[in-house]
Design a protein with these regions (language model features):
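Short acidic/polar hinge/loop motifs at secondary-structure boundaries
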Residues: 65-68, 187-214, 302
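Gram-negative outer-membrane beta-barrel transporters
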Residues: 463, 564-567, 586-674, 752
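Flexible loop and strand-edge segments within Gram-negative outer membrane beta-barrel domains
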Residues: 280-301, 307-372, 378-396
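Short, acidic, small-residue-rich periplasmic hinge/interaction motif at the N-terminus
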Residues: 33-39, 44-51, 80-84, 94-139, ...
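N-terminal periplasmic accessory domains that precede
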Residues: 96-101, 146-149, 168-171, 183, ...
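Extracytoplasmic beta-strand/coil segments of soluble accessory domains associated
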Residues: 68, 147-191
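C-terminal beta-signal and adjacent terminal beta-strands/loops
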Residues: 570, 665-674, 697-755
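Membrane-embedded beta-barrel scaffold of Gram-negative outer-membrane proteins
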Residues: 371-385, 493, 501, 534-592, ...
Length: 755
């Protein structure tokens, strides 16, 4: 704990010193006013930002603000406030002080950006259906990291992978998160060794937005997207506030500190340094099974990037370093005493990850709408894990390169082409001992994949009416084979407020069975790879309709409905039904099991501003996911058959107080066949449906916010999440059968400081 506090103080002082050396920028001062019964009054806490950069501030209690002037002239300054139309002012070089009067004018201005940031919305501009979770939406929850950022979303499900490691996993369209391509600002991010624990490597306070798209994505981004894509946008040094600090503490005494600072070197060059520290050193056992409900944890996460913006050229260069340790198991487990015996059961998880990245864009002079983009990243990841007598060590070395040329034949005909290269070098070792210390099983699986690829994409567009994107790519995988990935996306604006989208395409991925399925190590099951695993391959088809209505006072309502189907040509099947003593991995169709594996997902969502500053959202989803196993065609385990979602948000005048509430209704899911186990609880082959409630209250001040909240308000918990907890080295032990909450009611609080 003392190390975390010392580190946090050091980081805060360092970033403040860096900020103090920034060059003095040119400042615009102003006041925002409104008419009230023919009298002018100040408008406190209005949003003020530059249109070109979205760099902004807010007014104080007297309606005053100061903002740094961008280098470009003239510049457009936008002022927005809930209940008023935006005002846009053209700032020239001679303007130092301005006065802005907001009115309730119902006529649309030239700039039609809505006042007040929505928590989430469906982008009407993108051909691929994309749900955007904004900064405002992220602030409605504690959002300690990426895994906790989807509680308000009906698209993504989040749950624990096991009852001892604290790791969370996601699902989309009823399939595991590994089939969704996870990106950081359009660079492949969490893959390979990061699959099981990587969601915690993305602190919530670092994120500017999350973009969730269903179905296959553009061929420009690669071939791995099967069910969708999750792209995370971090805060930028060009637009972020100079200094930010967020401190969080929970009723379980988990502490988190996020701090960052931006530094503008000159009008073209800027940098940002981010630091994150999380610490949990207290042991808890709410269900009295003798095991820690959450492991002890400490994580240090550093991120630095430099951004250069010149005439026709921009570049980003940076690095990310993560060091995380988790220690758990039985309450009285001591690693120094019990590490190699069968007296007490313990777990240890150590991760070190380092990544370098760069993004570059060039405008081609003399050619309209023509540019070249180059992205590159290098990643090193070391992982050492043990669960009782099962141990795993893995190393990943990866390189990524993507080069894109984009131009147009005319305003209606755009094209892109380029090449990519993905290199992955895995060294994985897995060993499981029996209780008498004899070998149960052992695997040494080195794997090197060198994948050069080429792609081309054509876009036909009738502005405000129709967009068609057809893409194809070919990749040669040195470990597997050459494969071709076709994809098609269509967007039709039926009316100005109704949009129909459709998509179809293929996706491929290579499975890393150990690093992607760490949860099964928390059991007595033996890993059995009974087939020569092939490349996973699937088709995905989808259609969705969205409709928007606009009302007075800037209120609106939206309705979306979509259906997506995924058909696997080949899948690495994870079979935990064939035997309770091992987990089998094999290709779809192995041993004449058939060749069917599919997912159907139907979802509808309605969101409305019921009245001024009060928003209500309701959503419902149905999943139908089945796989051909050795025992026949069965529903995929741990996939909820349905889900309901209710969200409510209310803000007082000037958004001084904000109240957010979420209710999830999670449907039943099939449990694996455990009839032979005397330790198995009786659920009639299905888990029960349950409700999960969250709430948060935020008080906003000039430069800081205070928030308090609660998760799992109803205190609903899965009974006996660890089978055979009293005999962890017996064949009856299994901590991987998780279908519901394993933690009880939790309270938290925190402060966000922005300077």
């Amino acid at each position: 704990m003392n190390k975390i506090i010392k580190y946090s103080i050091f980081m805060a002082l360092l970033l403040l010193m860096l900020q103090s050396h920034a060059q003095a920028p040119e400042i615009i001062k102003g006041t925002v006013l409104q008419y009230n019964n023919s009298k002018l009054e100040a408008v406190p806490y209005a949003n003020v930002f530059w249109l070109e950069t979205q760099k902004g501030t807010s007014t104080d209690e007297k309606g005053n603000f100061t903002i740094e002037k961008p280098g470009k002239n003239p510049s457009h300054l936008v002022v927005s406030f809930v209940g008023y139309k935006n005002d846009t002012i053209i700032i020239t070089t001679d303007k130092k002080e301005i006065r802005i009067i907001l009115t309730n004018n119902t006529e649309l201005s030239e700039v039609t950006i809505t006042g007040g940031m929505e928590g989430s919305y469906i982008s009407r501009l993108k051909p691929i259906k994309t749900e955007v979770i904004t900064q405002a939406g992220l602030n409605k929850l504690a959002c300690c990291n990426l895994s906790e950022s989807f509680e308000n979303s009906a698209t993504v499900d989040v749950g624990y992978s096991d009852a001892v490691s604290g790791a969370k996993q996601i699902q989309m369209l009823g399939l595991a998160g590994i089939y969704s391509q996870l990106m950081w600002e359009n660079i492949p991010f969490l893959r390979g060794l990061s699959s099981s624990y990587g969601l915690s490597y993305v602190p919530g306070s670092w994120m500017e937005s999350i973009q969730i798209s269903k179905g296959t994505s553009s061929v420009i981004n690669g071939y791995e997207s099967v069910t969708g894509q999750i792209n995370v946008e971090y805060k930028k040094p060009q637009t972020a506030k100079p200094f930010f600090l967020n401190y969080y503490i929970s009723s379980e005494l988990k502490n988190e500190l996020n701090v960052f600072s931006t530094h503008k070197i000159n009008k073209n060059l800027s940098t940002m340094l981010m630091g994150h520290g999380s610490f949990m050193g207290t042991k808890w056992d709410e269900n009295n099974d003798g095991f820690m409900d959450q492991p002890k944890l400490n994580q240090i996460n550093l991120f630095n990037r430099w951004a250069y913006e010149g005439n026709g050229y921009h570049s980003i260069l940076g690095f990310n370093f993560v060091n995380e340790n988790r220690d758990g198991g039985q309450m009285d487990y001591d690693e120094n005493i019990h590490r190699n015996d069968t007296v007490k059961y313990g777990i240890g998880i150590k991760n070190q990850r380092f990544q370098l990245f760069t993004k570059n864009g060039f405008e081609v002079k003399g050619m309209d709408e023509t540019s070249i983009g180059i992205q590159a990243a290098a990643t090193y990841h070391k992982q050492d894990v043990y669960f009782g007598l099962a141990t795993y060590s893995g190393t990943q070395k990866s390189l990524y390169l993507n080069a894109i040329f984009q131009s147009e034949l005319s305003h209606q005909h755009l094209y892109s082409f380029g090449f990519s290269y993905q290199y992955d070098n895995y060294e994985e070792n897995y060993t499981k001992l029996k209780s008498n210390k004899s070998y149960d099983t052992s695997y040494n699986r080195p794997r090197v994949e060198s994948v050069p690829g080429v792609f081309a994409q054509y876009t036909f567009e009738i502005p405000e009416k129709l967009t068609v994107i057809a893409g194809i790519r070919a990749d040669f995988n040195s470990y597997y084979r050459t494969f071709v990935t076709p994809r098609l996306h269509v967007k039709w604006n039926i009316t100005k407020s109704a949009t129909l989208r459709a998509s179809a395409g293929k996706g491929y991925r290579s499975a890393s069975v150990f690093s992607e399925n760490m949860g099964y190590m928390a059991s007595s099951r033996t890993v059995m790879i009974v087939d020569e695993l092939d490349l996973e391959e699937a088709w995905n088809y989808g259609i969705n309709l969205s409709k928007c209505w606009e009302f007075k006072e800037n209120r609106k309502a939206t309705f979306t409905i979509d259906f997506y189907r995924t058909d696997f040509i080949n899948q690495v099947v994870i079979d935990i039904d064939h035997s309770m003593h091992h987990v089998d991995f094999y290709n779809l169709g192995f041993n004449n099991t058939g060749g069917k594996s599919y997912s159907n997902s139907l979802q509808a969502e309605f969101n409305i501003d019921a009245f001024k500053r009060f928003n209500v959202g309701v959503a419902a989803r149905i999943n139908d996911v089945k796989v051909d196993y050795l025992k026949g065609t069965m529903e995929k385990p741990y996939v909820s058959k349905y889900k309901g979602l209710l969200t409510m948000s209310y803000a007082t005048k000037y958004e001084k107080w904000m109240f957010d509430f979420t209710l999830q209704l999670n449907g039943k899911s099939r449990l694996p066949n455990m009839i032979m186990s005397p330790a198995a609880p009786v659920y009639d082959n299905y888990s029960p449906a349950y409700a999960f409630l969250l709430g948060q209250v935020t008080r906003k001040f000039r430069n800081f916010d205070i928030y308090i909240g609660s998760e799992n308000i109803s205190d609903y918990m899965q009974h006996d999440p660890i089978m055979g907890a009293s005999k962890p080295f017996s064949n009856a032990f299994d901590a991987s059968m998780i279908w519901g909450p394993i933690m009880g009611r939790l309270f938290y609080g925190g402060i966000r400081l922005t300077i």
